[in-house]
From Swiss-Prot:
SUPFAM superfamilies hit by this protein: P-loop containing nucleoside triphosphate hydrolases (SSF52540)
Propeptide: 201-203
Membrane listed as a keyword: yes
Protein name, as recorded: Ras-related protein Rab-13
Location relative to the cell: Cell membrane; Cytoplasmic vesicle membrane; Cell junction, Tight junction; Golgi apparatus, trans-Golgi network membrane
Originating organism: Rattus norvegicus (Rat)
Leader sequence segment: none
InterPro entries: P-loop_NTPase, Small_GTP-bd, Small_GTPase, Small_GTPase_Rab
Cellular component, GO annotation: bicellular tight junction; cell-cell junction; cytoplasmic vesicle; cytoplasmic vesicle membrane; endocytic vesicle; endosome; Golgi apparatus; insulin-responsive compartment
Domain notes: Switch 1, switch 2 and the interswitch regions are characteristic of Rab GTPases and mediate the interactions with Rab downstream effectors. The switch regions undergo conformational changes upon nucleotide binding which drive interaction with specific sets of effector proteins, with most effectors only binding to GTP-bound Rab.
Post-translational modification: Ubiquitinated via 'Lys-11'-linked ubiquitination on Lys-46 and Lys-58; impairing the recruitment of guanosine diphosphate (GDP) dissociation inhibitor 1/GDI1.
PTM sites of type Cysteine methyl ester: C200
Length: 203
């Protein structure tokens, strides 16, 4: 019996507690939003199969607790991850400053060459913004990674961010041997077309 997918990619979301990691995963995997999620205890994951470049990609997206006391639990899960999304909250400057610590944690624990993506969540809360887009763009350039601003609440750029990371992993693993590594268009990921006027950025 043929497999229901061509590739299985394990993705990991890391970042401070309260930045919206669980909400992002629920939005991506189930297209749902609930603002009352309690802080994740331990680790959980969701699965969604998407189509990118004509390949069926099964994404196993792992949620991690941001609290330091869970660091030993999260460390074990870095190793098998093919892609890591570093999440901060645009209304919380400290969560952005701590991205450098999370970068260090990736370097110490993850596989060499793991794909990374920087994600500024809660961009629907523009009035409370503490982290300017330019700051994050600068950090992303510094580390040579992609950057998106998302809103799990309004669904802005959530599919696009996961699609971008999955596509980069696919290219790296030889899923497509083309020289075209430009950023993904909205057609790369077969999802429902969500119309919105939110001005969150993607990079």
């Amino acid at each position: 019996m043929a497999k229901a997918y061509d590739h299985l990619f394990k993705l990991l979301l890391i970042g401070d507690s309260g930045v919206g990691k669980t909400c992002l995963i629920i939005r991506f995997a189930e297209d749902n939003f609930n603002s009352t999620y309690i802080s994740t205890i331990g680790i959980d994951f969701k699965i969604r199969t998407v189509e990118i470049e004509g390949k069926r990609i099964k994404l196993q997206v792992w949620d991690t607790a941001g609290q330091e006391r869970f660091k030993t639990i999260t460390t074990a899960y870095y190793r098998g991850a093919m892609g890591i999304i570093l999440v901060y909250d645009i209304t919380d400057e400290k969560s952005f400053e701590n991205i450098q610590n999370w970068m260090k944690s990736i370097k110490e624990n993850a596989s060499a060459g793991v794909e990374r993506l920087l994600l500024g969540n809660k961009c629907d809360m523009e009035a409370k913004r503490k982290v300017q887009r330019e700051q994050a763009e600068r950090l992303a350039r510094e580390h040579r990674i992609r950057f998106f601003e998302t809103s799990a609440k309004s669904s802005v750029n959530v599919d696009e961010a996961f699609s971008s990371l999955a596509r980069d992993i696919l290219l790296k693993t030889g899923g497509r041997r083309s020289g075209n590594s430009s950023k993904p268009s909205s057609t790369d990921l077969k999802v429902s077309d969500k119309k919105n006027s939110n001005k969150c950025s993607l990079g």
